[in-house]
């Protein structure tokens, strides 16, 4: 799921993705936006 958080590295997506899907969520930074994966 893409979320409305800008990023330059996946580390910036860590907290928003964990807030969304919990502590085992996965994250990537794609095209300047965070993408979160369900655990």
Swiss-Prot record:
Keywords: Calcium-activated potassium channel impairing toxin, Disulfide bond, Ion channel impairing toxin, Neurotoxin, Potassium channel impairing toxin, Secreted, Toxin, Voltage-gated potassium channel impairing toxin
Lineage of origin: Eukaryota, Metazoa, Ecdysozoa, Arthropoda, Chelicerata
Domain of life, per lineage: Eukaryota
Function field: Blocks human voltage-gated potassium (Kv) channels Kv1.1/KCNA1, Kv1.2/KCNA2 and Kv1.3/KCNA3.
Homology family: Belongs to the short scorpion toxin superfamily. Potassium channel inhibitor family. Alpha-KTx 02 subfamily.
Localization terms from the record: Secreted
Tissue: Expressed by the venom gland.
A Pfam family: Toxin_2
SUPFAM superfamilies from the UniProt entry: Scorpion toxin-like (SSF57095)
Protein name, per record: Potassium channel toxin alpha-KTx 2.23
Alphabetized GO MF terms: ion channel inhibitor activity; potassium channel regulator activity; toxin activity
Cysteines engaged in disulfide bonds, as pairs: 7-29, 13-34, 17-36
Gene source species: Centruroides bonito
Comment field on protein domains: Has the structural arrangement of an alpha-helix connected to a beta-sheet by disulfide bonds (CSalpha/beta).
Residues with site note (Aromatic residue of the functional dyad): 37
GO terms under cellular component: extracellular region
Site (described: Basic residue of the functional dyad): 28
